[in-house]
């Protein structure tokens, strides 16, 4: 008779569960910091696997894109239909320093703008900021009734649509190409460009609901750490040295 192991005896008890490991035990929380143009700087937190061996947590975080409501960034519910994209460019301690990556409208807002008896006019243009960011801006506008108009519809003629679109692209080109990305973001928040278009096209056809509905980042320049730090108010210029005023009395020798 062959002597060997009894397979039935070596088996463990049926129904024993494997020891489950908490997946969050190997992860860390990092804070997300918004750049200067926004009022609220602490956006939220994000999870990442801890640095182990050749896998660095910082490398996993860099390049992450977060979509945040502009209402949360500005503490203003009037901006709730706009979403801002923020991109992680640098890690400092347990904080992710982000930069502006794009802007978009919520789909429900866009659908609510489209109505009967009016003309929808759209324009898009690719512009380059003074700090070499290549962006594509999409504008949207709708015709409205003139004062004391009896006619129900507000349809614009093809020649008027072309003239309005030309004016839209001119204004966007002028406003976007003459400033940095940060300055452009400051213009996009209060919708300065939309108001400029509305004012400039009054002579062609009165417009309403004029918005920059989308901003797409196509190309960015070489990463500049100093520029990013200045956006987050951590450029280190305050630590360089400050003039200290002290009470100092010049001693005068009475006798030589």
From Swiss-Prot:
Keywords assigned: Acetylation, Cytoplasm, Ribonucleoprotein, Ribosomal protein
Biased amino acid composition, Basic residues: 1-18
GO biological process terms, semicolon-separated: translation
CC per GO annotation: cytosol; cytosolic small ribosomal subunit
Keyword S-adenosyl-L-methionine attributed: no
N-acetylalanine carried by residues: 2
Matching InterPro entries: Ribosomal_eS1, Ribosomal_eS1_CS, Ribosomal_eS1_euk
Protein localization: Cytoplasm
Region (Disordered): 1-22
Function recorded in the entry: Component of the ribosome, a large ribonucleoprotein complex responsible for the synthesis of proteins in the cell. The small ribosomal subunit (SSU) binds messenger RNAs (mRNAs) and translates the encoded message by selecting cognate aminoacyl-transfer RNA (tRNA) molecules. The large subunit (LSU) contains the ribosomal catalytic site termed the peptidyl transferase center (PTC), which catalyzes the formation of peptide bonds, thereby polymerizing the amino acids delivered by tRNAs into a polypeptide chain.
Sequence similarity: Belongs to the eukaryotic ribosomal protein eS1 family.
Subunit structure, interactors included: Component of the small ribosomal subunit (SSU). Mature N.crassa ribosomes consist of a small (40S) and a large (60S) subunit. The 40S small subunit contains 1 molecule of ribosomal RNA (18S rRNA) and at least 32 different proteins. The large 60S subunit contains 3 rRNA molecules (26S, 5.8S and 5S rRNA) and at least 42 different proteins.
Protein name per Swiss-Prot or TrEMBL: Small ribosomal subunit protein eS1
């Amino acid at each position: 008779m062959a002597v060997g192991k009894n397979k039935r005896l070596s088996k463990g008890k049926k129904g024993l569960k494997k020891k489950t490991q908490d997946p969050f035990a190997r992860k860390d929380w990092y804070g997300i910091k918004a750049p200067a143009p926004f009022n609220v700087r602490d956006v939220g937190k994000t999870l990442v696997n801890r640095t182990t061996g050749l896998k660095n947590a910082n490398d996993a975080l860099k390049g992450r894109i977060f979509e945040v409501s502009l209402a949360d960034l500005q503490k203003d519910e009037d901006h709730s239909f706009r979403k801002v994209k923020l991109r992680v460019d640098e890690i400092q301690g347990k904080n992710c320093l982000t930069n502006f990556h794009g802007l978009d409208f919520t789909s429900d807002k866009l659908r609510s703008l489209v109505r009967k008896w009016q003309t929808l006019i759209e324009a898009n243009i690719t512009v380059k900021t003074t700090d070499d960011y290549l962006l594509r801006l999409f504008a949207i506008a709708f015709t409205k009734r003139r004062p004391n108009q009896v006619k129900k519809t507000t349809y614009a003629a093809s020649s008027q649509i072309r003239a309005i679109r030309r004016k839209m692209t001119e204004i966007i080109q002028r406003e976007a190409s003459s400033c940095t990305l940060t300055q452009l973001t400051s213009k996009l928040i209060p919708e300065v460009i939309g108001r400029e278009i509305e004012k400039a096209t009054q002579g062609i056809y009165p417009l309403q609901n004029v918005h920059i509905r989308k901003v797409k980042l196509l190309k960015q320049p070489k990463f500049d750490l100093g520029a990013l730090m200045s956006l987050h108010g951590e450029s280190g210029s305050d630590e360089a040295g400050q003039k200290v005023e002290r009470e100092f009395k010049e001693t005068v020798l009475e006798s030589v």
